[in-house]
Every structure is written in C-alpha cells, then in structure tokens.
C-alpha cells in the first residue's frame, strides 16, 4: 500500500519497471471503495523527461479500480501524483499495474469489493453494534435527525446533547456544525424529539448543566445558555479564544483541541491535540502558548487557564475518576511502533511525544500500557455503585480504528496503577461516550462516514443499561432541599455527585452549609467518593476561608 504524506495535493510515487517497455494499459486499485480519487500518471524513459499519460486531477467519479489505456512506448518509469479525493481521503492505493498487452482479469473478491463503489449514498445504514452480555441496547438516535456525531454529553436529567460536525476531521466548509438536543419522552430508549440547541463550527467537546452548555469548538471554548428553558440556546459567551491554531481553517479540526470533562475539583479539563495553540486567551486575559499536545484546564467561567501536563499526541478526552485520577487513551498512532497508549496522567508530567518517549523513555512519565494500532477517540471514567461489577467503576475508551469501546479497570499500585483492558462494546467507529444521572449510557458511532461530508446517512447513537438496573428519574436539583442535595453529593453515582455539587455552589456560602460539608467529609461511614466530593465542594464554596476546616480534616487518620 502506498499513501500520500497528507491530504494536500502533490504527493507522488515513482515506479521503476527495471527496463524500458511499450506499455499499453495501466490500472490502479485504490484503498477506499467510496472515494473519488484525483491523480495524474506520467511516464518517462530516463526519469527526467516526463510525458503526461493520464489526467484525472479533477475526477469526481467514485471508483476503486481505475484502468486506463495509454500509449507509453519506451517507458521505464511511471510517476503517480495524488491530488486528494472526495470525500477528503488521503491519496492511497493498494496496487499499480503496467502491462504491454491487455489487462488481466482481477480476482473475483477484488471485483466484488470494487462494485460497492458508488456516487450515491447508501440506501441503509443499519447500525453495526454488538451489545455486551447482561446489557440492554437500543438505537437511541440516527439519520436523518442525528448524523455525523462527533461528541455528546448527557444531562443529569436524561436529555442528550450531540455535537454534529458534517465536516468531520478534514473538511473546512463553514456552517456545517451544530449541537442537537435529543429527548426520549416515553422511556423506550429512543429519541422522539430532536431540535437544534445551538450552531457552531466543529463541535468537539460538550458539558451540560442547568441550562448551560460548554462547547469546545476549536479555536474556542464557548458557554451557550438556555435561559428560558425552551431547549434552544438564547445567549452565548466566549470563555477562551485561540485554543487551537490556524490549521482549523487550512486542514480542518483534526489534531486540534478535542473533548472536555468537568472534575469534582471545579476545573474543566481540555484534551489538546498535538498541533497545540499559540495564542489562547482566557476570560481573565490570561494567555498561553505551546506546541504539542496534552491537557489544559480552566475554570468554568474561563479564568485561571493553565497547562496540566504535556507530551501527548492527539488525545480526544480526559477520563476523570471521583478522586481526580485522570486517564487517557493516547492516539499516538504514527505507525512504526508509535501506537495507542493508555496513560495515568499526573499534573506537570511530560509524556514524551514526539521527541522523547520512543528513544529516551527514562526521561519521561511512562504510559501504563501500549496497545498497538488504533485510533483513540472519546472516553470517560464512570463510577456508579448501582451498576454491576466490573462495569460500575472503570475507564471507558472509544477506539474508532478498532471499532470497539474498551473497559479498563486499572488496579492501584503505589502512586499509580496497573493497566487493564477488555472489550466492552463492539460498535462500528465509536466517537464518544457519556452517562446520565439515571445510569443510562450513550455511545455515538461514525458508521458510514469518511473524513469530511460524503452523504447524509452517517452515524448513530445507542443507549445501554445493565439488565438488572432500573433507571430512576433524576430530580431537578434546583427544587431539592440542602439535605437532599447532600444525599446526592455522597450518593452512588459520580454524575449525581457532580451535579449536586454544582447546585450547592450556585446557592452560595453560609454557616449551615459549611458545617454540613465538614460533617460529611468527616464521616467514615460515607463512601470515599462522597467524602472526597464534600471536601472539594467545601473548598470551592468557602474559598480561602475553607483552609482552617481543611487543616482540621487533614488531622484525621482516615483522611489523606
């Protein structure tokens, strides 16, 4: 297989036949069956003076096998120059043939595969997904209402927000991105109401809480607000600008900035692809610049932006557990032994990409495991004691290249963890994953799509629940008493803990809340995740005034 260096026109391959021959027919077998490849073929006797034989530089016809009659007398060398493809595939082919006579017949399986080539969209896009044992699965949303799903976030109360980018990773046309809001009003596991919540280019990461939707759409982090709760954003505020490079306009959103997750510590964590950024400006005017990839974090209001760690390639999400351990599926997929890594991310650590980790491993923070080829996408840590073991406390990572969602149950080992991975869900080209407050999981798929817009019938979203778990409606936290919020803050689900915390913080500081949080943090009978949530809530609620109580808590032998 030969592949162009990138999607830009001009990459070429030179073929030497060994001796000059009179060539009458040539044939290319391209990698993709649904690509309209654009190319030129030239011939030469001496590799200096070239004659144009085939010009398909403006081709729009979808064909995987492209035969051509040529008049190439006394030709030893051929040059195939790629000008890209529609959709935005890189030029790549399996085979180039040159014959002095007629073209030989191709093997039947090659002909059969190439006959799938067509300029028309597929008539069906039947979701290809294999649910894990012990789980119920429904197709929650699919075209035409929901297609090209890049990212998603589940509201605690069950609404699902899906980031749609018809331009994919390499398309550059503006006006093709949006976030849709999906509702299942009758509880059958399928969305029956879908509307556009907000429009923007290249949505890559979403967080929703209480009418507010944070959207990472490179080069911006924007807060969209639905103040009248009609399901459509009516206000927006730019929190961070320049959190990418100008390659968004030149190359598309690939390798720019990606998923976002909110931790119980009061920060939004941004997965930064390896193009980095050179003029990221927060809401408070703070400016950062750094090439490469890793994690940046920022407060929900766009202030205090800072680099958390660095030296990763194209991570698409940060998976945060209740104790603020962070894991990533590192898309270090350059080939030649540069593969998918699973990492425990530690603040200030350097993970070595691209300069160190292959040849100077002793100078970097090592990954927990290397899993070979793949294409890591969205991920999350999910803690919920209502789910059966081992599914209720683990890292879930999507791998687009391997068409699977993996479950990781990393076991503590000193200051870090031992790696673990098993296949959780077989699903075609998964892109993102999230869970709502009732314990319903959602996974999006890019099935049927390429690297930019090709046709409308692309992608779907599924919903999963354990068979022994009956989802209970998650309450409107704004209508709960403080006592009820404390129960959710220390409750079984990481999602519940976070959204209870956010409501407590909205209500503001008073003496009763401070005392209640100190009591929760001190109670050894409360699950550890709940006590940790109480400590982080206390600090965010009381600010510097929390120091005295935090010092007293640190004296307790069961608080470390």
Where in the sequence are the language-model features?
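Amphipathic alpha-helical scaffolding segments comprising HEAT/armadillo-like alpha-solenoid repeats
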Residues: 479-487, 509-522, 542-554
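Aromatic, loop-rich ligand-recognition surfaces of beta-strand-rich domains
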Residues: 1-112
């Amino acid at each position: 297989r030969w592949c162009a260096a990138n999607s830009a026109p001009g990459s070429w391959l030179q073929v030497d036949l060994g001796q000059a021959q009179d060539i009458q027919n040539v044939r290319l077998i391209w990698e993709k069956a649904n690509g309209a490849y654009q190319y030129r073929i030239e011939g030469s006797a001496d590799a200096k003076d070239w004659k144009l034989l085939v010009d398909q530089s403006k081709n729009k016809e979808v064909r995987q096998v492209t035969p051509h009659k040529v008049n190439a007398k006394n030709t030893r060398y051929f040059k195939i120059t790629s000008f890209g493809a529609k959709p935005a595939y890189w030029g790549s082919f399996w085979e180039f043939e040159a014959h002095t006579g007629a073209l030989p017949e191709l093997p039947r399986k090659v002909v059969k595969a190439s006959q799938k080539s067509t300029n028309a969209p597929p008539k069906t896009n039947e979701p290809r997904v294999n649910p894990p044992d012990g789980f119920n699965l429904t197709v929650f949303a699919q075209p035409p209402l929901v297609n090209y799903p890049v990212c998603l976030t589940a509201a605690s109360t069950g609404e699902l927000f899906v980031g749609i980018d018809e331009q994919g990773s390499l398309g550059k046309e503006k006006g093709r991105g949006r976030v849709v809001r999906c509702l299942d009003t009758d509880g059958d596991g399928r969305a029956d109401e879908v509307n556009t919540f907000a429009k923007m280019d290249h949505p890559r990461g979403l967080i929703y809480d209480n009418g507010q939707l944070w959207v990472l759409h490179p080069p911006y982090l924007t807060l969209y607000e639905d103040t009248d709760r009609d399901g459509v954003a009516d206000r927006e505020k730019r929190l961070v600008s320049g959190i990418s490079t100008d390659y968004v306009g030149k190359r598309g959103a690939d390798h720019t900035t990606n998923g976002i997750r909110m931790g119980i510590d009061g920060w939004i964590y941004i997965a930064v692809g390896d193009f980095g950024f050179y003029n990221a400006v927060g809401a408070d005017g703070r400016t950062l610049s750094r090439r490469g990839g890793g994690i940046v974090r920022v407060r929900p209001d766009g202030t205090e932006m800072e680099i958390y760690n660095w030296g990763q390639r194209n991570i698409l999400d940060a998976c945060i557990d209740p104790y603020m351990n962070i894991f990533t599926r590192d898309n270090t997929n350059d080939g030649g032994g540069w593969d998918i890594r699973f990492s425990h991310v530690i603040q200030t650590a350097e993970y070595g990409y691209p300069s160190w980790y292959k040849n100077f491993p002793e100078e970097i923070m090592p990954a927990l495991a290397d899993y070979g080829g793949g294409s890591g996408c969205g991920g999350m840590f999910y803690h919920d004691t209502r789910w059966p073991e081992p599914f209720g406390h683990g890292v879930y990572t999507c791998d687009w290249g391997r068409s699977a969602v993996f479950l990781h149950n990393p076991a503590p080992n000193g200051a870090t963890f031992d790696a673990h991975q098993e296949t959780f869900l077989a699903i075609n080209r998964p892109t993102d994953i999230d869970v709502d407050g009732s314990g319903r999981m959602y996974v999006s798929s890019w099935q049927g799509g390429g690297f930019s817009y090709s046709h409308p019938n692309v992608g779907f979203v599924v919903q999963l629940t354990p068979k022994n778990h009956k989802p209970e409606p998650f309450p409107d936290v704004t209508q709960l008493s403080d006592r009820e919020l404390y129960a959710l803050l220390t409750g079984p689900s990481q999602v519940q803990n976070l959204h209870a915390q956010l409501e407590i913080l909205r209500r503001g500081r008073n003496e009763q809340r401070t005392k209640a949080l100190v009591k929760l943090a001190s109670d050894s009978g409360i699950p550890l995740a709940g006590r940790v949530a109480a400590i982080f809530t206390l600090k965010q609620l009381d600010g510097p005034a929390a120091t005295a109580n935090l010092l007293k808590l640190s004296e307790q032998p069961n608080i470390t």
